């Protein structure tokens, strides 16, 4: 769970000397990873609902100049439906659908937000989806996949020619992971691949996409949530002052966080490619 405050267990990450891609060896993958995603429940995510909406509203501002006036959108890894809920309020004339492996999260999206959501992975649902989406988005998904190229090719297959694909993922070549090393908060067991801008571009080109723009991905977080993250990774002597800060700061205050270690990519489908 990416909202977890536990960082004690760190994966073994190796770097390919040929392609420069960093990844966790398959032998070190969490056992039954697909079942884990299907069964995951994360009430903490619901507690940070306001900040997630603010984050997705910011993402919409970043991608909006590239979207047509009307169309259909697919979100892969739609989780509890917060992005799609923000999207439908801004783009009421669009059709949209989400795909989410977590049974708990997809049911929340359907029952609480009335978001059209299919349970399962993209591969599970690909035969039931359209093949002409104007836009596909996938926020914080690519690092979780054991076959990122295969995933991108499947994304390509459900999109219109010249369709727009927007996603966020990690940039391990950024200054922050270099500075923090093993204490970098996004170094966690459920993240299998760690990208750099050039390795991400190589994958996208192989999958038939061209990058139109790369930007910093902006997270909005409450002071309380940020302090909790910091307590988990900083020296113990800082725990007391951080807890004091949590206790005296109004919970409604949210701040933008953008160190550049997570990038937002806006891409265009240039050509179809063969299925994997």
Segments and roles (model prediction):
Residues 140, 144:
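A short His-aromatic
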Residues 146-150, 177:
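Short N-terminal helix/helix-N-cap motif within the alpha/beta-hydrolase-1
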Residues 149-164:
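A short glycine-rich, Lys/Arg-flanked "PGG" loop and its adjoining helix->strand segment in the class I
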Residues 2-3, 188, 248-256:
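Short, P/G- and charge-enriched loop/turn segments at secondary-structure junctions
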């Amino acid at each position: 769970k990416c909202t977890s405050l536990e960082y004690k267990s760190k994966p073994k990450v190796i770097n390919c000397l040929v392609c420069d891609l960093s990844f966790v060896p398959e032998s070190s993958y969490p056992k039954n990873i697909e079942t884990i995603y299907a069964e995951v429940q994360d009430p903490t995510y619901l507690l940070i609902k306001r900040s997630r909406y603010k984050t997705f509203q910011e993402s919409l501002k970043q991608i909006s100049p590239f979207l047509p006036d009307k169309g259909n959108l697919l979100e892969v890894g739609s989780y509890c439906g917060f992005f799609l809920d923000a999207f439908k309020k801004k783009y009421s004339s669009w059709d949209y659908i989400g795909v989410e492996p977590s049974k708990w999260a997809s049911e929340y999206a359907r029952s609480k937000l009335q978001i059209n959501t299919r349970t399962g992975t993209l591969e599970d649902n690909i035969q039931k989806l359209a093949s002409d989406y104007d836009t596909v988005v996938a926020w914080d998904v690519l690092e979780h996949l054991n076959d990122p190229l295969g995933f991108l090719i499947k994304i390509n297959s459900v999109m219109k020619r010249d369709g727009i694909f927007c996603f966020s993922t990690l940039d391990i070549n950024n200054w922050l992971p270099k500075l923090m090393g093993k204490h970098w908060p996004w170094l966690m067991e459920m993240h299998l691949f760690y990208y750099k801008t050039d390795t991400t571009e190589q994958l996208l080109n192989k999958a038939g996409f061209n990058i139109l723009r790369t930007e910093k991905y902006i997270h909005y977080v409450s002071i309380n949530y940020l302090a909790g993250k910091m307590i988990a990774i900083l020296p113990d002597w800082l725990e007391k002052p951080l807890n004091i800060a949590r206790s005296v700061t109004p919970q409604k205050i949210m701040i933008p966080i953008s160190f550049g270690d997570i990038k937002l990519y806006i891409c265009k489908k240039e050509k179809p490619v063969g299925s994997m």
